[in-house]
Amino acid sequence: MSEADQKPVIIHTDGACSGNPGPGGWGAILKFGDVEKELKGGEPHTTNNRMELLAAISALEALTRPCSVDLYTDSQYVKNGIGSWIHNWKRNGWKTADKKPVKNVDLWQRLDAALKTHSIRWHWVKGHAGHAENERADQLARDGLTENRMKSRVK
C-alpha cells in the first residue's frame, strides 16, 4: 500500500502558559480511524511558543512508524515557522535574517527531525472559535499546566 493510500493520522495540538514566561502545558489528540490517544505535559518555567512547539513534537514523536499526518494547530508561530521561516533558518545555520540565534532552536530542530520521518500536512485553525478538537487540545494543555504547577509545589 502506498503512502497516498494510507489513511492519515489526525493530530490536534495546543499549548498554554500562565504568564509568558511562566508555568505552561501542552496537549495533543491523535486519531487514527477509531483509535484515539490523548497526550499532555508541561514545564514549570516556559513560554507559550515553546508549549505550542512541544505539543506538535510530542505528538509526532509518539508515532511508532512513519505516517501520513494531518496536523492542526492554532499557533501562528508554529504555522509560520514550519511553513516559511525554518527553510531560511537551516540555510543560515539556525540564525534569523538579522543573524541572531533562532529562539527555541532545540525544539525547532526536534520538529525538523520529525519532518524527515513523517509526511505532514499542516493546518491552521483559529483558536477558541468552536473547533471541538482544538478546544479539547486546549483543555489538555491547561490540564498539563495545572498538573505541572501542582508537581512543582509538592517538591
Swiss-Prot record:
Region feature (Disordered): 133-155
Main localisation: cytoplasm
Chain positions recorded as Mg(2+) 2 binding sites: 14, 138
Positions of the RNase H type-1 domain: 5-146
Listed GO CC annotations: cytoplasm
InterPro entries (UniProt xref): RNase_H, RNaseH-like_sf, RNaseH_domain, RNaseH_sf, RNaseHI
Catalytic activity: Endonucleolytic cleavage to 5'-phosphomonoester
Record: residues binding Mg(2+) 1: 14, 52, 74
GO BP annotations, alphabetical order: DNA replication, removal of RNA primer
PROSITE patterns: RNASE_H_1
Superkingdom of origin: Bacteria
Signal peptide: none
Record's keyword annotation contains Metal-binding: yes
Subcellular localization(s) per the UniProt record: Cytoplasm
Subunit structure: Monomer.
Function: Endonuclease that specifically degrades the RNA of RNA-DNA hybrids.
Family listed: Belongs to the RNase H family.
Cited PANTHER family: RIBONUCLEASE H1
Entry protein name: Ribonuclease H
Originating species: Rhodopseudomonas palustris (strain TIE-1)
Gene name, Swiss-Prot/TrEMBL: rnhA
